[in-house]
C-alpha cells in the first residue's frame, strides 16, 4: 500500500504458488489466509474484515472445476449461497444448470460439495431456521422465479433477507439409470428440495412461509447447498 503496509504475501515453489497466501487490509490487519497448491486455491481459508471480525460474504472457486460460488454467513454458519453445479459422473442431471444448478441422487449429493464444505445435516438446517426466525421460508427464498399463488396475482417469491436465495428448482423423480426422455422433472417454480446427510430433504414452498424436512427417495434428484465444516 502507499502507506508502506504490506499488501500480500505469496509463497512460490518450483514456479507455482504453493502454501498459504496472505492478503492484508491497509491498516495492516489480515484480510484473507488462503491455502494454495499449484496456483489453485484448495480450501476455503480465513476471511476477515479490517476490524478483525469475520467477513460475512464473498466468493469461493471450486478447485475441482473452477466454478465460482457466492457464500454468505448467517448466524454462526457459512453457506454456499447458490445451488451446486458440480458435474459428478452419472448421478446428477439438470434442466437449467446455470440457474438452478444440478439435481443429485443421494450418493452423488455426498460428493457434490467442494473442499472445506459438507452436505448439511437436518440440525444444520434447523440451526439456520433459528438464526433467521419466524417465516424462514419467506426470508430465505429468492425474490424471483417462484410461481404465482393459486387464485391470486401474487407470486410465491421470497424476500431473500439474508442473501440465501433459495430457488424453486423442483426435483427429479426417477432413478439415474432411467432414460433421460422418460425421466420426470417436477415442481420447478413451486418447490426447492435440498439434501441432508440423513437422506431427507429440506423443502421450500411457493405457497408456504416455512421450510419443512421431508422423506425423499435416495435414487431421485434434489438440489445441494453446502455448509462450511
Report residues per predicted region:
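Conserved positions within compact, well-structured domain cores
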Residues: 53-229
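Glycine/tyrosine- and acidic-biased, solvent-exposed loop/turn segments at the edges of beta-strands
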Residues: 1-55
Amino acid at each position: 500500500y502507499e502507506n508502506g503496509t504490506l499488501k500480500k504475501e505469496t509463497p512460490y515453489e518450483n514456479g507455482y504458488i504453493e502454501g498459504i497466501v496472505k492478503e492484508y487490509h491497509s491498516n495492516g490487519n489480515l484480510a484473507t489466509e488462503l491455502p494454495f497448491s499449484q496456483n489453485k486455491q484448495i480450501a476455503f481459508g480465513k476471511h476477515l474484515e479490517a476490524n478483525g471480525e469475520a467477513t460475512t460474504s464473498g466468493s469461493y472457486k471450486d478447485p475441482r472445476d473452477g466454478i465460482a460460488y457466492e457464500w454468505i454467513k448467517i448466524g454462526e454458519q457459512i453457506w454456499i449461497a447458490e445451488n451446486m453445479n458440480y458435474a459428478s459422473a452419472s448421478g446428477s442431471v439438470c434442466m437449467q444448470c446455470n440457474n438452478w444448478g444440478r439435481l443429485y441422487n443421494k450418493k452423488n449429493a455426498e460428493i457434490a460439495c467442494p473442499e472445506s464444505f459438507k452436505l448439511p445435516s437436518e440440525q444444520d438446517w434447523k440451526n439456520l431456521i433459528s438464526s433467521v426466525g419466524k417465516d424462514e421460508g419467506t426470508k430465505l427464498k429468492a425474490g424471483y422465479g417462484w410461481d404465482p399463488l393459486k387464485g391470486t396475482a401474487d407470486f410465491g417469491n421470497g424476500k431473500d433477507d439474508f442473501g440465501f436465495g433459495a430457488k424453486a428448482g423442483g426435483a427429479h423423480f426417477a432413478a439415474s439409470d432411467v432414460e433421460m426422455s422418460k425421466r420426470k422433472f417436477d415442481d420447478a417454480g413451486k418447490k426447492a428440495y435440498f439434501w441432508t446427510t440423513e437422506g431427507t430433504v429440506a423443502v421450500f414452498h411457493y405457497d408456504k412461509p416455512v421450510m419443512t424436512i421431508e422423506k425423499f427417495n435416495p435414487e431421485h434428484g434434489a438440489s445441494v447447498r453446502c455448509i462450511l465444516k
